[in-house]
């Protein structure tokens, strides 16, 4: 019998949460390549005409998103295409396109992308806003800001201000906030098997504590009636449902909203390690890799009442 690439403690945990054989199968498969058309520079129709050698399949939950495959050759090097260098499209995993779609920023909004690097979601937000309004694209890592700046420039983003700061120091209130939080990446194992080597329960606990601090900061930065979207590419309950449950208990004016998308979803986890979470968390979107053949993702939409 072949030995699993997953640690024993990992298997013990996940076998209680999902169909582990399916999770393992999809986590060890190559991701389908996907792109998002950058409508700041080109229309969907125009890009399709330029990529005639490539088969583009619509991603149901994102109008500008497509899975991409060469019609005749076994090519995966879409990053080398001139259209990519010119910023006509962004190479972005299909599930990663969901949080900006859920946030749904308008052209007159003041938006905070709290952990913005390397910029996939920032550029998506800018495209949705048609380069209007203002995006504060923030990160606390100086090294990561370099890639953010390059991607914003390549994609022709002109409504974003890059900041290197902790969000609690902003003397601003935002209409919309995206908190795509640092996480364990357990939903994105198929992108990097290194995740399996670095995974351990102690690091999950540390990340959960950080995420709780970040979501409190984000909620405090939100205007009344504003919208906060929290997301991770983790499938750990402690990084997802537990963080949202923590926020709901701390702020009575934090209200979860339903997420309605054309996507297969799995039930939110309402109990883990003898902890019971609010039934409101059923409104969150939990996606396992096997649900839609994507990365695993978790998304919550919160309104400040």
Name each region found by the language model:
Residues 1-305:
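S-adenosylmethionine
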């Amino acid at each position: 019998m072949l030995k699993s690439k997953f640690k024993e403690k990992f298997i013990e945990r996940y076998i209680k949460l999902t169909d582990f054989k399916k999770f393992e199968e999809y986590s060890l498969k190559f991701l389908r390549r996907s792109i998002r058309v950058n409508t700041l520079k080109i229309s969907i129709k125009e890009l399709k005409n330029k990529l005639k050698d490539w088969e583009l399949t619509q991603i149901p939950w994102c109008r500008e998103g497509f899975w991409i495959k060469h019609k005749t050759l076994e090519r995966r090097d879409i990053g080398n295409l001139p259209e990519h260098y010119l910023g006509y499209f962004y190479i972005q995993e299909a599930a990663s396109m969901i949080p900006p779609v859920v946030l749904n920023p308008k052209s007159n909004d003041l938006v905070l992308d709290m952990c913005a690097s390397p910029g996939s979601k920032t550029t998506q937000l800018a495209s949705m806003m048609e380069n209007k309004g203002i995006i504060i694209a923030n990160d606390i890592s100086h090294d990561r800001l370099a890639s953010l700046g390059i991607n914003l420039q390549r994609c022709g983003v002109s409504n974003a201000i890059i900041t290197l700061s902790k969000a609690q120091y902003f003397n601003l209130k935002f209409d919309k906030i995206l908190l795509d939080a640092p996480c364990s990446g357990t939903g994105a194992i198929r992108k990097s098997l290194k995740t399996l080597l670095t995974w351990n329960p102690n690091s999950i606990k540390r990340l959960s504590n950080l995420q709780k601090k970040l979501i409190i900061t984000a909620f405090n930065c939100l205007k009344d009636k504003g919208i906060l979207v929290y997301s991770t590419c983790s499938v750990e309950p402690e990084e997802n449902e537990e963080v949202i449950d923590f926020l709901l208990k701390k702020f009575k004016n934090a209200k979860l909203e339903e997420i309605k998308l054309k996507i297969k979803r799995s039930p939110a986890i309402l109990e883990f390690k003898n902890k019971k979470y609010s039934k409101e968390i059923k409104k969150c979107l939990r996606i396992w890799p096997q649900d839609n053949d994507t990365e695993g993702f978790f998304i919550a939409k919160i309104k400040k009442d």
